[in-house]
Amino acid sequence: MTYNITSKIMPNAKLPLEYVKNTFDKRNKIAKQKSIEFYKNITNECKDGVYSISRIRKCIDNLFAPNKINYTINSEEREQFSGSIANILSIDKEKQILQYDGIALFLPLKKNKTEVENKYTLFHEVRHMIDYLYNPKVKMHRINNLINNEGYSNATDYINKFFMEEISSKTNMKEFRKEASDLIDILPRDIAIETLQKIRSHLITEINAYSDEIRYRFKDIKNIDDFIDALNLKLSYKLNFKFEDKLKFANKKLNALLKEERASLKKQFD
């Protein structure tokens, strides 16, 4: 089934235009500054080590003030210490409008459901939230097109997950690039371009979030266990996820497809 969905970002799910009209590099720089600001504020707010939802909400609200962002904080039930972020979406099927109503943060909560169990997962997911708010049009454009191309959703979802998963010790980047290229080549060129653009955005925000989490872990080292945890995450990020290498490949593949698309369009009008 195919749709012709248009998207609409609701007022409380975005920042005003003056906050996001800069170039990508400038927006990314501001997002990094906001992440540092949140880290400093929440660390100061939670000097007793209790990262309660009420304190987290206070710091997030202050971070984006005077703008009011609609978001929820939920318990992540998948596995200990894991976290995730999702869109709060609603669809008006009659008008065929996809509404982006806000952001849902999923964090590892303690049994009392009022405190975060791992503050570094919090830092990681809040960086995702910041990145999404400073790149709202990119985010909605990707969602919009993927819904309109529902017939390929299983394939595009699989490819996206393939890029985000750890690379097995038995698999090197050369093998990854070949398998990824084979998967992308199955798609029609326009869908492949859209998928790679989504993957590129996803990889960039993962690089940002992991870089922040690693930096804050090393900054907070108080004993040998803290050092080992920070080092293990850094090694896993560099050796297993290889997000920077994947981003280079995605950009190269995307550029090649865009070149083919431009040549095809030129040929049509010659």
Where are these regions (language model features)?
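Short, charged/polar micro-motifs that form catalytic or ligand-binding hotspots
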Residues: 112-116, 120-121, 195, 199, ...
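Post-HEXXH active-site segment of zinc metalloproteases
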Residues: 116, 132-186, 194
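Active-site scaffold of zinc-dependent metalloenzymes
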Residues: 76-119, 126-133
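Pan-zinc metallopeptidase signature
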Residues: 177-201, 206-270
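Acidic-residue sensor for enzyme active/binding pockets
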Residues: 117, 125, 150, 206, ...
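Sec/Tat-exported extracytoplasmic proteins
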Residues: 130, 134, 217-220
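Non-Sec secretion/translocation targeting segments of pathogen effectors
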Residues: 1-14, 18, 209, 267-270
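Zn2+-dependent metallopeptidase catalytic core
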Residues: 27, 34, 43-68
